[in-house]
């Protein structure tokens, strides 16, 4: 008996739809004051669509408090997604703060510091030595 396999493309399509719908639902339906301006960066689905890791960033407020509030509202968001999505299983939502931007800024800062140090060392090496 052959099993029907879902294509990886379907997984990506559903993740993208969940990302779009969650962005709108969080903005319009969630009234928790701990949730400021939130951007859903990406959604990762398990192959069986049972769980979804939702990565977000926030412009205002504490990321930890926002994550706690979003995870608290995940049941309500799950129910709202169920009404919008036409799939058999709507995944359980798990919200995670996306630190990619902070890590990129820190890495860029380290690179800038290394370049400045190298330029300073090169300038000192090129300077003529003083005779006493």
Swiss-Prot record:
Q: Which Pfam families match?
A: RBFA
Q: Which UniProt keywords apply?
A: Cytoplasm, Ribosome biogenesis
A Gene Ontology cellular component where this protein is annotated is: cytosol
Localization of this protein: Cytoplasm
Q: Which InterPro entries match?
A: KH_dom-like_a/b, RbfA, RbfA_dom_sf
Q: Which GO terms describe its molecular function?
A: ribosomal small subunit binding
A Gene Ontology biological process noted in the UniProt record is: maturation of SSU-rRNA
Family assignment from sequence similarity: Belongs to the RbfA family.
Tell me how this protein assembles.
Monomer. Binds 30S ribosomal subunits, but not 50S ribosomal subunits or 70S ribosomes.
What's this chain's function? One of several proteins that assist in the late maturation steps of the functional core of the 30S ribosomal subunit. Associates with free 30S ribosomal subunits (but not with 30S subunits that are part of 70S ribosomes or polysomes). Required for efficient processing of 16S rRNA. May interact with the 5'-terminal helix region of 16S rRNA.
Q: What is this protein called?
A: Ribosome-binding factor A
Annotated gene:
rbfA
